[in-house]
Design a protein with these regions (language model features):
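Secretory pathway export signals and precursors
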Residues: 140-143, 160, 207
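Short cysteine-rich clusters marking metal-coordination/redox-active sites
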Residues: 132, 144-147, 158, 164
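Hydrophobic alpha-helical transmembrane segments that serve as membrane anchors
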Residues: 1-128, 168-265
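Short, flexible, mixed-charge glycine/proline-rich loop motifs
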Residues: 131-139, 148-152
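Short, non-ligating residues that shape and space the ligands of small metal-coordination modules
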Residues: 153-156, 167-170
Length: 265
């Protein structure tokens, strides 16, 4: 009887995780398509997404144990990339050099976040950085309520990447954020200067000036909405980088200095 109850509970939990994994890949494209109706609807949809993100960040940590947020990150990247490749590039206004630089930055972003996840998965579950909860925590360990593991040298848990960030993978997290910022900055600028009326800022660098006509054609509207969504991501990443600069980067440098100092002794 007890085994049947446990199996039933496990089945319900697995179904919930499957649903949480799939929903972002359906919900985000739907929201982006709805946002193409008009500028007012675009602002409403983007505000809705932003308020949803703020709500998630304000919830107790143990309630964020879901693959939904990681799937949202993946679906965001995939949607914006597909719009860029199938929408923006099809207008044939972006040079090969600009596209090459964009792809290099994107590859750097993917590599850094892949390494961050791979190191976290190995160190926490197969290596020495994670272990089952102990009532007595050591000075360099912290119990993660989401991973449900005691994590050594932990900085924080990223629900958007579904892993703990600690000393071995922190540099990949930081570099991934820098690459992601550069990728989105270039991608949104290329997209907006392609679909809007651009103006020369300096040399060959252009910025969008007039985007009033984008809602008259679906392809243009979808590209514009995706760029607005990308700008929202840019602002979030900028805040993340500022937080790293003032809080976690000094801590990381201090840890590295301490380790190398002890090693030299």
């Amino acid at each position: 009887m007890i085994q049947d109850v446990l199996l039933h509970g496990s089945s319900k939990s697995n179904k919930k995780w499957d649903r949480d994994t799939i929903i972002p890949f359906m919900l985000l494209p739907l929201l982006l398509v709805v946002a193409t109706v008009s500028l007012t609807i675009t602002m409403i949809v983007m505000t809705f997404i932003g308020m949803g993100a703020l709500y998630v960040m304000s919830r107790p940590r143990q309630k964020n144990r879901s693959p939904f947020f990681y799937s949202w990150t993946l679906s965001s990247g995939i949607c914006m990339f597909l719009v860029y490749e199938l929408g923006v590039l099809s207008m044939l206004q972006i040079t090969q050099l600009e596209n090459f630089v964009f792809l290099v930055l994107l590859a750097g972003t993917c590599y850094c976040f892949y390494k961050m996840k791979a190191i976290a998965d190995y160190e926490l579950y197969l290596g020495t950085k994670g272990k089952e909860y102990s009532p007595v925590l050591t000075s360099d360990s912290y119990y993660c309520q989401i991973c449900q593991l005691e994590v050594n040298e932990r900085f924080f848990h990223s629900i958007w990447w579904d892993c703990c960030v600690f000393r071995p993978n922190y540099i990949y997290f930081l570099c991934g954020q820098v690459f992601a910022f550069a990728t989105l900055l270039l991608g949104t600028n290329l997209g907006l200067t392609t679909i809007c009326h651009p103006v020369i800022l300096y040399g060959s660098v252009m910025i969008p000036q007039d985007c009033n006509d984008v809602y008259f054609e679906f392809n243009y509207a979808l590209c514009f909405v995706s760029c607005v969504y990308g700008i929202g991501y840019l602002l979030i990443i900028a805040l993340v980088l500022l937080r790293q600069l003032f809080i976690y980067l000094p801590k990381y440098i201090g840890n590295i200095t301490h380790i190398y100092g002890a090693y030299n002794l």
